[in-house]
Amino acid sequence: MLLVAIFIHEYEKKSKFYLDDKYYSSNEFISVEDLNEIEHDSYIMYTYGDFCAFSTPCEDIFKSFMDQYNISFIKMHYDNFKNTKYYKSVLYPPSVLIIKKGKLIAFLNAEDDNDINKYQDSLEFKNWVDKYVYLDKNS
């Protein structure tokens, strides 16, 4: 029974899904201070600090993606992010989190060399998001 539960959990993490409709309707950063109102939503979140060490500001890469696919991101300053349940997994800003019905599916790790290119290359970032999320709500 435990193996079945683990299999189902892993399948859900790997299966592609749609964001909630409201995140496909525009291409903006939606600033929030807490996640209570969207606790069960499916969305993409950008958490950031006061300093970005990347040569190209990663927010520019993310905004370009949002403009191209007409997708909005939740945006939360890292000081507020520390009070969320996701802080146990995402310890360093900046990061992008993919959330499915309130559960963390994937995130970019600013400390992981394998993720650095996704912060700096719009195609790499798009390919990463596309592994988890349908980019068009009509797909």
Cite the ranges covered by each PLM segment.
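N-terminal targeting signals for export/organelle localization
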Residues: 1-23
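Local sequence-structure signature of Cys/Sec-based thiol-disulfide redox active-site neighborhoods
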Residues: 28-68
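Short amphipathic alpha-helix with an adjacent loop that forms part of the alpha/beta core around
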Residues: 35-37, 85-89
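Thiol-based oxidoreductase modules, predominantly thioredoxin-like and allied folds used
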Residues: 47-49, 66, 70-84
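Structural micro-motif
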Residues: 87-100
